Amino acid sequence: AFVPAASWEETRAVDPAYVCCTFRGSVTALNVSDGSVVWKSWLVDEPRKTGVSAAGTDLYGPSGVGVWSAPTVDARRGLLYVATGDNYTHPATDKSDAILALDMKSGRIVWTQQTTAGDVFNATCPRGAPNCGPDHDFAAPAILVRAANGREMLVAGQKSGVVFGLDPADGGRLLWQTRVGQGGTAGGIQWGMARMSIVASTGS
């Protein structure tokens, strides 16, 4: 079994006394016969102290990169495709707001396709905090489809309101992108996406 991890810790940043943030997104492989951990893949480095807030509270980063949805299994390639969310605190990292391919046997990250760089967002951002990103997580899983021409691709929808077509056979290379809605912290594509042949085949 493959278990993703996400967190609402970014909402705690609104408390001036809260030491924010130390959550790290991950995927864990468990042995279904006894529940033992086979491997665990962290998606962001260990947070470290980066400064002190105006309230005198320690600040930590990097953090975040939660996985809000189930991984997509590609048994033929032996890969898991994982859709990630934003960073909660600086510094921003290259695995946030991204589609990642992990080796199913080891958890090793095989490739990363980040679609929104520098997206750092927490609960202080709506109050005008500096250096805030757009909160454009991938909250829905990527869909592995076969296009009309027989080509396999990954289709992933983001809170930005953009759908992306990626090539799983070529390191997640971006094939196309299409805006289908208005993005935002509660907009775009969040908790699911239908499989549509017109989108998968043409990106339009």
Task: Put a short name on every predicted segment.
Residues 7, 86:
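Residue-level signal for short, function-critical loop segments
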Residues 1, 10-11, 16-62, 74-80, ...:
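Extracytoplasmic/lumenal domain signature
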